Amino acid sequence: MRRRDLPTEFHASAPMRLDFAGGWTDVPPFSAREGGVVVNAAIGVRAHVALTLGGKLLRFVSEELGETLECANAGGLTGHDKLPLLMAAVRMFPVLGGFTLTTRSDAPAGSGLGSSGALGVAVVAALTRAREETLSRQDLADHAWQVEAIEAQLPGGKQDQYAAALGGFHRLTFRDPDVGIEPLTLDPAFAATLERQTLLCYTNTSRASGATIARVMRAYERGDREVTAALHGLKETGAAMAEALRAADLGRVARLLSDNWKHQQALDPGMRTADMERLEAAAVKAGALGGKAAGSGAGGCMFFIMRGDARVAAKTVVEAGNGTRVLPLAWATEGVRTW
């Protein structure tokens, strides 16, 4: 690879996701032993990466976290608590010479929208483009998961990376190491209604999912009956959600969201925070048909299917206080893109 033959700037952007059902079943060891089913949809909230080659230092800038880290050489890419995902990505996909790697997120930190998975996909896409390598979207997702879960040792499943790489609605099946990809083609009118009536809220409470994931999977490994039953319930709900979306059955989609949330709460006592409880009550008052936490729970975002236009309900929810923020929602048919 000859630096003078390459452009000096590379950009990538990848969407985050709403996990409609089955989340947690993509996480090992459950996904390896029993297989998982997840239904998710990419959304217009994205992670952004800019890679500028040049200079003497390896410089990392996380605008969303307000953190900057500089290394004199590749030897400085280990032993840091800061920005572990970015460090891990550059260890796996090094580029020649100095650079500045800048990241930005449309979502609050710890949102539960799969922001680290989307960021990982975008970073790997930018780095491989700089290395003149071409990867399929599935390979991008797989490599981004390896960066996060193995190299950076941040536990989690694969659904976030696949949503970010692919875009759109998908039914994903997991039997490690294999991932089955089944696009879900929704009736256009139903997709528009679903978008219009989905209310996405940030609880104003950030959370780090790693500790919760580790705690739940330890309970599963020691044979905890309640946790194991909840994981199987989540898997069944994932399969049912795919059918409800195909059938354009909004009421059933809403009920399954709530079913999923009940199973999710059975995984860990800290899954539902006081802020989440208050947000749920406000959403029900505003006409929620069903809803759940986005991602692993214990803070971050929640989303609800409303009886009517979510924009009308948003006013009631925000007026309930607690610092709740309503986030914009649009389905994203396009996955990761580079330029």
Identify the residue ranges that each predicted region occupies.
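C-terminal nucleotide
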Residues: M1-A21, D26-A32, N40, G44, ...
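Short gly/ser-rich anion-binding loops that grip negatively charged ligand groups
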Residues: A72-H80, G110-G117, T134
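Glycine/charged-rich beta-loop-alpha catalytic/anionic-binding loops adjacent to active sites
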Residues: L69-A74, G98-A109
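Glycine-rich active-site/cofactor-binding loop and its immediate structural neighborhood
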Residues: G299
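Short pre-catalytic strand/loop immediately N-terminal to key active-site residues, enriched for Gly-Thr
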Residues: A107-S111, L289-G290
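Short secondary-structure capping/junction motifs at helix and strand boundaries
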Residues: L96-T102, E133-L140
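DPxDG-like acidic metal-binding loop motif
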Residues: L113-R137, A165
